[in-house]
C-alpha cells in the first residue's frame, strides 16, 4: 500500500507539503494540490483519518443531534446533511436526544465535548446558553435548524406565517368552515411548532371573520393520526367542515384517505392542504406549503463548514435566517361546494 512518503516522492514535494495538499489546510498552490491529489489517486493512497486529525486538529466529523430519526421531515433533513457532508469529505455522527435530562447531560458533558466532532448541528432542539458556551469554549461551532437560538447560527421557517398562508388559500376559495388538524399542544418540541401553526390558522380565520368553535383537532403527527382524526371529524355530515388545514403533509394524506374511505370527493366535498413537500403529496395531488426539507440539511452543513473556516456573524440578526416556503397548488383544494 502506498504511503504519504511515496506520494510526496513521486510528486517531487516534501512530505509536509503533500500532507497539506491532500488535507486542504495550509498554504499550497492550486497546481500542487491538483498534482498531489492526482498522484495519490493513481497510487491508491488513502490518508489515515487519525494522522490527518493529528496534523490539522480536526476530525472531519460533524455531529447531528435530533429528537427523531423515523419521521419523514427528520429523515429528509438527515439525508440532506449526510449528502452534503459526504460531498465535503466529512463523516456524520448521529445522536438521537429524548427528553431524558440525564441523557441530555451525558450528551453535552461527554459525547459532544470530549468526542472528536468538529461542529454540532441541532435539529429542532433548543440549545441552552450554558451548552452553547461549553461547546463554544472548545471551538465547536453550532448550527440550528427549526428556530432561533441566541448566539447560534440558525435556519427556520415562520410556522405562524406559513399556517396563515395555508389557511388563506382555502379562504380565498370560499371556505368558511375550516378545521385545523394539528399536533398535541401539551407535548411539543422546543420551538412549539404546533402552537405556532394553530395561531397562524386562527389569525387567518379571525381576519376573515370566520372564527368558530371546535376549530382544532389534536392529532398524532403521522399519516395514521390524520386518518383517525379524519374518520372522527368527517363522519357526521351535519357538522362536517369544508376544508382541513393540516399541520403536516403526512397528516393531510391521512385525512385524505379517511375522506375517500367515507365516500367523500376531494376537493368536491372537502379541500385539504398540508405543509412540508412530501413526495407522496405530489402523487396524490396534495396542495401544500413546500419547505424544501432536504435543502435545510445542506444549508446547515454549508454554514457549519463556513464557521469552521473562520466565518463569524456580526450580530444576532445575522445569526437567524428565515427560509422560504412556497405554496404548491394541486388537486386537493378547490372552490367550496354551494
Residue ranges and their predicted role:
Residues 231-338:
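Flexible loop/turn connectors
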Residues 67-76, 95-103, 155-165, 181-231, ...:
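Hinge/beta->alpha junction and helix N-cap segments in small-molecule ligand-binding domains
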Residues 1-60, 73, 205, 337:
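N-terminal helix-turn-helix DNA-binding module of bacterial transcription factors
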Residues 17-20, 55-70, 177-187:
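Short beta-strand segments enriched in small/hydrophobic residues
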Residues 2-5, 61-168, 172, 239:
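Alpha-helical recognition/docking segments in bacterial nutrient-uptake
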Residues 14, 60, 118, 176-177, ...:
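Short acidic/polar active-site loop segments enriched in Thr and Asp
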Residues 46, 86-91, 141, 176, ...:
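Residue-level detector of anion-binding/catalytic polar loops
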Amino acid at each position: 500500500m502506498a504511503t504519504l512518503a511515496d506520494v510526496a516522492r513521486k510528486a517531487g514535494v516534501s512530505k509536509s507539503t503533500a500532507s497539506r495538499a491532500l488535507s486542504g489546510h495550509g498554504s499550497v498552490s492550486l497546481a500542487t494540490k491538483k498534482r498531489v491529489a492526482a498522484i495519490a489517486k493513481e497510487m491508491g493512497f488513502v490518508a489515515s483519518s487519525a494522522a490527518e486529525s493529528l496534523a490539522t486538529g480536526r476530525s472531519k466529523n460533524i455531529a447531528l443531534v435530533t429528537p427523531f430519526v423515523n419521521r419523514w421531515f427528520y429523515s429528509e433533513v438527515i439525508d440532506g446533511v449526510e449528502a452534503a457532508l459526504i460531498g465535503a469529505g466529512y463523516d456524520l455522527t448521529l445522536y438521537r436526544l429524548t427528553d431524558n435530562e440525564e441523557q441530555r447531560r451525558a450528551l453535552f458533558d461527554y459525547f459532544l465535548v470530549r468526542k472528536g466532532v468538529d461542529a454540532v448541528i441541532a435539529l429542532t432542539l433548543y440549545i441552552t446558553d450554558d451548552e452553547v458556551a461549553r461547546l463554544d469554549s472548545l471551538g465547536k461551532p453550532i448550527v440550528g435548524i427549526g428556530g432561533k437560538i441566541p448566539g447560534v447560527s440558525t435556519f427556520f421557517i415562520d410556522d405562524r406565517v406559513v399556517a396563515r398562508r395555508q389557511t388563506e388559500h382555502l379562504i380565498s376559495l370560499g371556505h368558511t368552515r375550516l378545521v385545523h388538524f394539528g399536533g398535541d399542544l401539551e407535548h411539543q418540541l422546543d420551538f412549539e411548532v404546533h402552537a405556532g401553526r394553530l395561531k397562524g390558522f386562527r389569525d387567518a380565520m379571525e381576519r376573515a371573520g370566520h372564527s368558530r368553535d371546535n376549530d382544532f383537532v389534536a392529532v398524532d403527527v403521522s399519516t395514521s393520526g390524520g386518518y383517525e382524526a379524519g374518520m372522527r371529524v368527517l363522519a357526521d355530515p351535519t357538522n362536517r367542515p369544508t376544508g382541513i388545514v393540516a399541520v403536516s403533509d403526512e397528516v393531510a394524506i391521512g385525512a385524505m384517505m379517511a375522506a375517500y374511505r367515507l365516500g367523500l370527493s376531494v376537493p368536491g366535498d372537502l379541500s385539504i392542504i398540508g405543509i412540508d413537500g412530501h413526495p407522496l403529496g405530489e402523487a396524490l395531488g396534495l396542495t401544500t406549503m413546500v419547505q424544501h426539507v432536504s435543502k435545510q440539511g445542506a444549508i446547515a452543513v454549508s454554514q457549519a463548514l463556513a464557521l469552521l473556516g473562520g466565518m463569524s456573524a456580526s450580530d444576532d440578526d445575522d445569526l437567524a435566517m428565515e427560509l422560504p416556503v412556497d405554496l404548491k397548488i394541486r388537486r386537493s383544494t378547490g372552490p367550496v361546494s354551494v
